[in-house]
């Protein structure tokens, strides 16, 4: 058996060798040789792969070294060291700009979120305000209707005091409800407190009225007499009252106004006491002068004034304008007398018949004949005092036509029947 080994071929990068085997033996030797070749090939393949990887690494290192050399040459060429600070500052500013831009974007996003929350809150407030305006509109409509009903005169109702207070309390409640609905704070506790205070005020309202009654009862008796004189002067004719229409008004105006607002119940007793005092004073004065006492027609006439005064007071409570026209006696009597003319004349006509009967009884008790007719709108009395009283009753009957035909009765006649010293 002859074996020949050949050296590697020049220029080849592989470390494998070509083996030529000359086998002169049989088939068994050829198979063994093939097995050896395969084993050698299997052993050399990993070495070949490793050598290829080393070659690639060497090539990469060469490229890196070549690039480093190129950069070094460029740095030396363009003086990189001098521009190094400038490049760093530019990079720093660029980074800062990016950070500021990012922070601004975040801030804008936060502001946008806050604006959205504010818009939603304002939308809710707008809805609440619309609801409040709607409720306030309803409350104002109710208050308007209540005030219209309050200002509408009711001629059928004579007990205006308590109803007027209740209507005022209702008006106050509606006004407070309106203010409460339109106010920014809408708490249920405040509403309950307002209702409690309102109920307390309504319950406490009769107390000041009772105190006012007590104070008016303490007014001296002479002020009642002056009130009667002032009232008779205020209803006198326009031609005869200028000489003395301001005698008692300027000095006793407050007292007269306090008398005019007395309750109907208390005014009845007070007027009765005042009439008794006036009659007693007049009878005493006439007894001292030696004259006959005052006939009872004066009592009837003053009772008519009393009833007219009580009804006029109720009208004054409903209408402040009528209080002004009846209390201010320095104005024209023909204008101020119109609101209560019908009521006063009706009362006078009712009392004239009873005055005739009482006059006849009074004259019959004295044994004198007294005609009860009304010739020339005057009574026929025995003495001068009775004639003056008849003139006063006749003046009341002629008061219907005082605007067109003023009465000629002097003021001294009217004043003398009440203010005889």
Curated annotation (Swiss-Prot):
Give the Polar residues compositional bias ranges. 230-243, 403-421
Task: Recite the UniProt keywords alphabetically.
Answer: Coiled coil, Cytoplasm, Repeat
Region described as Disordered: 179-251, 312-334, 402-421
Q: Where in the cell is it found?
A: Cytoplasm
Q: Which Pfam families match?
A: Olduvai (PF06758)
Give all residue intervals belonging to the Olduvai domain: 190-279, 280-391
- Looking at the UniProt record for this protein, which Gene Ontology cellular component terms does it annotate, in alphabetical order? cytoplasm
Which InterPro entries does the UniProt record give? NBPF, Olduvai_dom
Compositional bias (Basic and acidic residues): 194-217, 312-333
- Segments traversing the membrane: none
Coiled-coil boundaries: 87-143
Homology family: Belongs to the NBPF family.
**Misc:** Encoded by one of the numerous copies of NBPF genes clustered in the p36, p12 and q21 region of the chromosome 1.
Specify the protein name: Putative NBPF family member NBPF7
């Amino acid at each position: 058996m002859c074996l020949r080994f050949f050296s590697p071929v020049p220029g080849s990068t592989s470390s494998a060798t070509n083996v030529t085997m000359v086998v002169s033996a049989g088939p068994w030797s050829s198979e063994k040789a093939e097995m050896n070749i395969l084993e050698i090939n299997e052993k050399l393949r990993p070495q070949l792969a490793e050598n290829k990887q080393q070659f690639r690494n060497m090539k990469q290192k060469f490229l890196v070294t070549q690039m480093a050399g190129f950069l070094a040459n460029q740095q030396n060429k363009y003086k990189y060291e001098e521009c190094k600070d400038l490049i760093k500052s530019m990079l720093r500013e660029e980074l800062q700009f990016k950070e500021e831009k990012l922070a601004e974007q975040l801030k804008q996003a936060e502001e946008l979120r806050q604006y959205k929350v504010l818009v939603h809150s304002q939308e809710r407030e707008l809805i609440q305000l619309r609801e409040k305006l709607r409720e306030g509109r309803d409350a104002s409509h109710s208050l308007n209707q209540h005030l219209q009903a309050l200002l509408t005169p009711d001629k059928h109702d004579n007990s205006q005091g308590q109803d007027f207070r209740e209507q005022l309390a209702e008006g106050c409640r509606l006004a407070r409800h309106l203010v409460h609905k339109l106010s920014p704070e809408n708490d249920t506790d405040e509403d309950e407190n307002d209702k409690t205070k309102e109920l307390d005020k309504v319950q406490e309202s009769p107390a000041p009225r009772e105190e006012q009654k007590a104070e008016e009862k303490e007014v001296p008796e002479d002020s009642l007499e002056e009130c009667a004189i002032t009232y008779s002067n205020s209803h006198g004719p326009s031609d005869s009252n200028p000489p003395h229409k301001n005698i008692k008004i300027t000095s006793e105006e407050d007292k007269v106004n306090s008398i005019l607002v007395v309750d109907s119940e208390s005014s009845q007793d007070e007027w009765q006491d005042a009439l008794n005092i006036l009659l007693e004073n007049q009878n005493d004065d006439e007894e001292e002068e030696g004259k006959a006492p005052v006939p009872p027609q004066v009592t009837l006439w003053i009772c008519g004034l009393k009833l007219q005064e009580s009804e006029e007071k109720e009208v004054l409570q409903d209408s402040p304008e009528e209080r002004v026209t009846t209390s201010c006696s320095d104005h024209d009597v023909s204008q101020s007398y119109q609101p209560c003319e019908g009521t006063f004349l009706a009362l006078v006509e009712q009392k004239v018949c009873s005055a005739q009967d009482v006059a006849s009884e009074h004259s019959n008790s004295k044994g004198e004949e007294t005609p009860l007719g009304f010739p020339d709108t005057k009574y026929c009395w025995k003495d001068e005092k009775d004639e003056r009283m008849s003139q006063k009753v006749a003046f009341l009957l002629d008061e219907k036509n005082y605007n067109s035909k003023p009465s000629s009765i002097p003021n001294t006649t009217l004043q003398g029947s009440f203010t005889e010293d």
